[in-house]
Amino acid sequence: MAKKSLNETSPVARFEQSLEELEQLVQKMEVGDLSLEQSLTAYERGIGLYRDCQQTLEQAELRVRLLTDPARPELAEAFEPPSLDG
């Protein structure tokens, strides 16, 4: 079977790939070895990846809301993750 391209992979796989690439870009930028042009290019790419991840998360939240109450998804309460403070 042929390998799937990025556009044919699942939203979860694309999200994970985007997040991994974003983390790698952040690490490169934090080291500080990039030129100004490279930093700007990395920043621009990072913003695009961030927006892709954010959109995927918003779509996932909508799916959860639709599954929770298909008749009235707008009334579903927003998911609040548990606090890690203890």
From Swiss-Prot:
This is Exodeoxyribonuclease 7 small subunit. Belongs to the XseB family. One of its GO terms (molecular function) is exodeoxyribonuclease VII activity. It holds the Pfam family Exonuc_VII_S. The keyword Transport does not apply. Bidirectionally degrades single-stranded DNA into large acid-insoluble oligonucleotides, which are then degraded further into small acid-soluble oligonucleotides. It catalyses: Exonucleolytic cleavage in either 5'- to 3'- or 3'- to 5'-direction to yield nucleoside 5'-phosphates. Keywords: Cytoplasm, Exonuclease, Hydrolase, Nuclease. The gene is xseB. Its main location: cytoplasm. It is found in: Cytoplasm. Signal peptide: none annotated. Gene3D superfamilies: Exonuclease VII, small subunit. It is an enzyme of class 3 (hydrolase). It comes from Xanthomonas euvesicatoria pv. vesicatoria (strain 85-10). Its EC number is 3.1.11.6.
